[in-house]
Amino acid sequence: TYVTRCLQKTDDIRRLTDRMFEYALVYDVSEPEQIRMIPFSLSRLLGLFREQMDFLELAGFHTDISFPDADISDITTPDALTIQADPELCKRILNNLFSNILKYGSKQETVTLSMQLPPEINKDAALCLALKNTVKPEHSAVESNRIGLKSSTRNMERMGGKLVVFQTNTFFEVTLSFPVTAP
């Protein structure tokens, strides 16, 4: 239908502009844009992940969110963990990661998000979120320029965090580590 085609074109344009920005961010050595670091609650960060996971489900993926180290009340209380982050950079990072899952991920296996809380809050404490999925067989040997991952890695570093990728021909895992601040 006409509306479906319009939505597809809108998505195509968004992806193209995202790619242009990513190329500029990764390869431009001039001064990067200013970031706006603000206190970001754990529940707010998880809300961004949940939105993306919900979108995957609408696209036909199976998802699972697992927090083995945390009681749900630990996550939703107002004084739960806080990170310092730029909300827009967080959204960009998640858009990159989840668009890769949409493009390369297999709908036959579950996409999982797991979280590891730091045992104690100190200067080295980090909140780790791991996103795992199986790669579609037809994409297992596809070469990519990894611009989105490079951009996401750089954005995590700009916020004082870290992004680590582990990948095989059939499996993809990315771990985001955010420095934690005391409530």
What are the functions of these language-model segments?
Residues 28-35, 76-85:
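Conserved micro-motifs of the catalytic ATP-binding
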Residues 156-157:
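Detector for a conserved hydrophobic position within an alpha-helical segment of the HATPase_c
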Residues 101-102:
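Short helix-loop "hinge" at the ATP-lid/N-box region of the Bergerat-fold HATPase_c
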Residues 56-77:
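Short conserved segments within the C-terminal catalytic ATPase subdomain
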Residues 90-91:
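A residue-level detector for a conserved hydrophobic packing site
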Residues 8-16:
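Short alpha-helical segment of the dimerization/phosphotransfer core of two-component systems
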Residues 125-147:
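Glycine-rich/acidic phosphate-handling loop/turn and adjacent ATP-lid/helix
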